[in-house]
């Protein structure tokens, strides 16, 4: 397998992996049973926050109380871009860390904007996937440039989403720990989103390498083609050597020169032939028969 094909397939493999992880990350939290119940963003001890459960998990679309036996209970109603804001989720409480009361907007908008960036990143990710597949089918400058541009745009939005989510929930962990409450990040969700970022980095680099290699090959080809045309224009047309005429002379001139020599530089040679009429004739009766033949013999100057 050539170097280019290897880079193409590595690029496509990593891009498909990033697309799969992003879809799974968005679907995570859609159900609070089965495997998806373990895909959450944040878990903390919320006992004493008015009517909040003792332990709460925040998912993509809702939050749920979490029991020690591994069952989600008392879940909130589902909604897209469920914000992380204990004050909005449970109401104000004196036992709640003060940062959630004083800096409510920071947590609220970090979580919601992070979700929006994730959806925008998924949109550009699908465009990137289509453009990369198109460049594999028929590679040209436009498809390669589109795939590269979409790869970097997708990387920007997915990375921005990962940073917003990480910043939001890392601040929340610090706030809960400051109040001696247990809190932790969801390892599976953050593992998925940062793995997606890594795959997209590799994809963007591969697309850039392919475009750079393609442009370099076109530049080398253009220069070699231009130099070949220059040499061909300066070199006379080779003509086979015929009759001592230089090979650089056109064929028509050679034919005209030979025709000219045939008319002016040939002489006629006569040869004499003796024949004996009969074997018994005497020498004095030998008859000489003059037979003249004409031959065109070229004269060597």
From Swiss-Prot:
Basic and acidic residues compositional bias, start-end: 282-292
Annotated signal peptide: none
TM helices/strands, residue ranges: 6-26, 113-133, 144-164, 192-212
UniProt topological domain (Cytoplasmic) ranges: 27-112, 165-191
Predominant place of localization: membrane
Pfam families listed in its UniProt record: SUR7
UniProt key word Membrane: yes
CC terms in the record's Gene Ontology section: cell cortex; cell periphery; cytoplasm; endoplasmic reticulum; membrane raft; plasma membrane
InterPro entries according to UniProt: SUR7/Rim9-like_fungi (IPR009571)
GO biological process: ascospore formation; cortical actin cytoskeleton organization; endocytosis; fungal-type cell wall organization; septin cytoskeleton organization
Annotated region described as Disordered, given as residue ranges: 254-301
Sorted UniProt keywords: Cell membrane, Membrane, Transmembrane, Transmembrane helix
Residues on Extracellular side: 1-5, 134-143, 213-301
Bias (Basic residues): 261-275
Subcellular location: Cell membrane
Bilayer disposition of the protein: Multi-pass membrane protein
Purpose of the protein: Involved in sporulation and affects the sphingolipid composition of the plasma membrane.
The family this protein is said to belong to: Belongs to the SUR7 family.
Protein name: Uncharacterized plasma membrane protein YNL194C
Species this protein is from: Saccharomyces cerevisiae (strain ATCC 204508 / S288c) (Baker's yeast)
Origin organism lineage: Eukaryota, Fungi, Dikarya, Ascomycota, Saccharomycotina
